[in-house]
Amino acid sequence: LCDAIELVTPGYNGANFSHIGLVVLENDTLKVLEAIPPKVMITNLYDFINRSFDKNRNPKVIVGRLKKKFTNSISNAVSYSKSKLDIPYDEVFLINNETYYCSELIYEAFLNDSIFELKPMTFLHPKTKDTLKVWKEYYSDLNTYIPEGNSGINPGIISLSNKIEIVHFYGIPSGMEK
């Protein structure tokens, strides 16, 4: 599904993203709090970074941070996210259904401070405007509808936020213009 997600979620400088997490400090060690199948969990930073690679075999990860004037939101966002540990992953990508997909967890964590905005979701090929076959099969297997046009959020939308600054590149995500 990562390729299908990346195709429909363009982000920072045209980069295609399929996942997002929140870096947290746990026992003096940087880790990543994320919603990934099967649940919301804390992952070792090394494992998170080395999950996906660019064509040069560098981790396909960029680091974004809230701009300084929004950093007062971080403590509450981390607490909120930790309160969701072990809640099941949201396979259908719907907001407000008591499960979480990666971007939804980040959105909800910062909701009280209105850091990120929901946008209409799409599962359509950007050129043909046809629903991608992989999404038809995926939602058919889940025995539910494709939430085309429903409000949602994705890693690309978050990376485009004017409240974020991109501060580091481990590698170059597909689609990214230098």
List each model region and its residues.
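Cysteine-nucleophile amide-bond enzymes
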Residues: 1-178
